[in-house]
């Protein structure tokens, strides 16, 4: 089916060429030049893993075809419509397009394009039946309650990083499983930005930052949810998820510090990092999770490292951050629940550390996230909740954020897990 779909798509492109050039709507030379401009644009952007031009890259390269150059064949076929005088010019265009696309084809055959990237499937070989039952019950309830497209809950052991529960639910069959899904972590990345900055000596919980918005970097505008915020400490910025503050934190720490530490926490800082954009812009995007792709497993394991006092799960159990930094992150994430955007995750009598996240996909499609662990001082469970395109109405408002949708689900899962463990 996939192959026939691709063939039909190719025929559709060729039929457009026939209508435009064959019926003399545009000269073959001019049309060929337009196609060459597409090739040139792809050559400038394709090697940067730019998500915005993924479809154009696919059209130009079509790497399933053995010669990898469908667009070049389209330009070549235009010579059939052109008079002898312009035929040589079109052949020149073909050669130019070939020269531009050749290195791109080689690069894509090695690295692959974003649209063809595949996540490693979630490891579910360590599931705990009791935790699995809790996760399945809670995600089924949440998807129904929030009229969501889909949702997923994962629970991990903070001592090993192993996933001990993984449950997903959707209102429609045939949706891509969260076991393979790649997505943006949104504001759930912010504790790791803070950890990198504190650990490097560039920041602290109490350090204050200018948080005025809008904030402009290289033509891109960044704003805060609350546009009235003027300044805040790092702890306040984490609690209230102040975008501009975290951007400034990342800029002070620097590209090398942030990328290195995020990589050590298990984040991919290469695939969505765009070489054609400035380091300042890329760093700002990273501070908000916009160019850091994650999976359910990679994100929950990063939070498990925080719960494990900053120690990784490799053979040496190496420390990614210092004990002092770990204490600061725990304190800030606990404050984010008691006094910040995660208030609906509060569990009476139990200390909770966590961070909300709200990701906007395709302009009006939302992911509501909450990641955290309980209890803070001696964590027993790490929990990640993601709700896709969920909502509910309250006092005439439609609520879609991680703090409003995912945080209450986290609370229910954590309460049930702790109760089950104490029986």
Segments and roles (model prediction):
Residues 401-423:
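Short, gly/Ser/Thr-rich active-site loops of penicillin-recognizing serine hydrolases
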Residues 129-131, 149-181, 196-391, 402:
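Beta-lactam-recognizing serine transpeptidase/beta-lactamase-like catalytic domain environment
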Residues 11, 26, 30-31, 70, ...:
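Alpha-helix N-cap and coil->helix boundary residues
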Residues 115-121, 125, 384-385, 404, ...:
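Small/polar-residue-rich segments within soluble enzyme cores
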Residues 1-119:
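Hydrophobic topogenic segments
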Residues 119-151:
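Conserved, well-ordered alpha-helix/loop/beta-strand core segments that scaffold catalytic motifs
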């Amino acid at each position: 089916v996939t192959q026939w779909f691709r063939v039909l798509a190719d025929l559709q492109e060729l039929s457009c060429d026939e209508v435009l050039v064959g019926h003399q709507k545009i000269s073959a030379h001019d049309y060929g030049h337009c196609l060459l401009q597409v090739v040139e644009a792809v050559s400038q952007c394709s090697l940067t893993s730019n998500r915005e031009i993924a479809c154009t890259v696919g059209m130009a390269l079509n790497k399933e075809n053995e010669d990898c150059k469908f667009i070049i064949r389209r330009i070549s076929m235009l010579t059939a419509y052109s008079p002898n005088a312009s035929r040589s010019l079109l052949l020149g265009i073909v050669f130019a397009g070939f020269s531009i696309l050749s290195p791109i084809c080689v690069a894509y055959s090695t690295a692959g394009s974003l649209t063809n990237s595949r996540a490693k499937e979630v490891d579910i070989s360590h599931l705990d039946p009791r935790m699995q039952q809790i996760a399945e019950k809670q995600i089924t309830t949440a998807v129904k309650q929030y009229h969501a497209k889909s949702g997923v809950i994962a629970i991990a052991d903070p001592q090993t990083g192993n996933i001990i529960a993984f449950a997903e639910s959707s209102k429609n069959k045939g949706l891509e499983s969260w076991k393979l899904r790649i997505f943006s972590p949104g504001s759930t990345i912010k504790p790791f930005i803070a950890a990198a900055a504190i650990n490097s000596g560039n920041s602290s919980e109490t350090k204050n930052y200018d948080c005025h918005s809008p904030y402009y970097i290289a033509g891109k505008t960044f704003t805060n949810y609350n546009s009235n915020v003027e300044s805040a400490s790092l702890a306040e910025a984490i609690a209230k998820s102040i975008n501009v503050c975290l951007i400034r934190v990342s800029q002070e720490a620097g590209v090398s510090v942030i990328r290195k530490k995020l990589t050590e926490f298990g984040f991919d800082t290469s695939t969505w990092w765009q070489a054609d954009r400035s380091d300042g812009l890329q760093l700002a995007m990273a501070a908000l999770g916009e160019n850091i792709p994650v999976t359910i497993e990679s994100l929950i394991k990063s939070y498990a490292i925080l719960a494990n006092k900053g120690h990784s799960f490799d053979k040496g159990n190496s420390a990614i951050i210092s004990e002092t930094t770990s204490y600061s992150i725990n304190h800030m994430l606990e404050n984010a629940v008691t006094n910040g955007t995660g208030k609906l995750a509060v569990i009476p009598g139990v200390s909770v550390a966590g961070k909300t996240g709200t990701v906007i996909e395709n302009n009006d499609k939302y992911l509501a996230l909450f990641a955290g662990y309980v209890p803070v001082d001696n964590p027993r469970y790490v929990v990640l909740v993601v709700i896709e395109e969920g909502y509910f109405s309250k006092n005439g408002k439609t609520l879609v954020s991680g703090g409003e949708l995912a945080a209450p689900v986290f609370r229910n899962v954590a309460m049930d897990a702790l109760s089950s463990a104490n029986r």
